[in-house]
């Protein structure tokens, strides 16, 4: 079975993982008129991001609306709406647009449910007449088959949609772009970025680094992270732009989400091996 939908993701996955786990900063060169003011403002920014990080980690889950645009697919947006959980390991339970995600060959419904839990992705598909999905309601793929072993390790260590917050707090230079209203809430807008040097220092394989750096170079050499934080010290929106993609995450509600569990094994067909081969071929591994 040829899984066309994976091709759009494979060449860019390494860069996406770097985006989620290594966003640094652009440097707020115009943040203040003097060195003392810059230090004071930098301290305030770090304090605000630290509070947001602590508060978000404490709540452990959220309802999120995500839109991803991939240059490889002509910029057609792929929407994913649902629950993300990071309190006890990485997990998500979302609905995504079937056609935009190129899943129409496996799912007739306009949206496809995707669950990520216990180190694997589960795609709700129509039972196929033959092959590993014959009579199965779900397609299982190991996270490592999509992201690579390093990406899977990063997800285990930093697997929540707000990982960017933790990495921005490690920088002494983050741009404070001022107050903005987002989703009807008053927020403060912060910005940082990651470049090839961050990829080189990552735990990605050499093939994955090559693919990530190539994707970064094709989009200007860096990936920019923007975060909008409200008065309750919670992110309202996070965007990541570059490396051949634009990802926007809007946080609708934090906490009090249902537990995410894997589908029954008897209803699941495993395509990890096939996806791994496609991914390795795409990045030349």
UniProtKB/Swiss-Prot annotation:
Annotated compartments: Cell membrane
Signal peptide: 1-22
Keyword check for Membrane: yes
Sites of S-diacylglycerol cysteine lipidation: 23
GO cellular component, as recorded: plasma membrane
Basic and acidic residues compositional bias, start-end: 276-285
InterPro entries: LolA/LolB/LppX
Annotated region described as Disordered, given as residue ranges: 264-285
Listed PROSITE patterns: PROKAR_LIPOPROTEIN
Lipidation (N-palmitoyl cysteine): 23
SUPFAM superfamilies, per the entry: Prokaryotic lipoproteins and lipoprotein localization factors
Membrane topology summary: Lipid-anchor
Keyword Cell membrane among UniProt keywords: yes
This protein's UniProt keywords: Cell membrane, Lipoprotein, Membrane, Palmitate, Signal
Name of the featured protein: Putative lipoprotein SCO2725
Organism phylogeny: Bacteria, Bacillati, Actinomycetota, Actinomycetes, Kitasatosporales
